């Protein structure tokens, strides 16, 4: 099991918890109360800085209930936090766009992350044909 260093920006932040067997994703919460109006953009502080192990990155995504509960969208789809973002002041944040007026309470679980190994080194080879069947285009299962 890997040990990950986490700096909390407040003593009353709920500590991160990995629940084996339940999900590979770890919830993150708003570090402060945030009030947004429809059309607002804001970087919501998540109250943690994390020293990822070398060779790893984190993928940050909204929880499935985030839009239903708060009407916010994560503006960069899935956020990617790389290994080098590990300083004492490198607090993780969730970039959001508000679709309606909302107040997100401090401690509300709004997003989740997982840690994944970096992509291996790749080399691309130019070819005239790939050799596989066409599936029918973008958005098609090929059926």
Regions found by a protein language model. Give the residues of each.
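DUTPase catalytic domain/fold
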Residues: 1-143
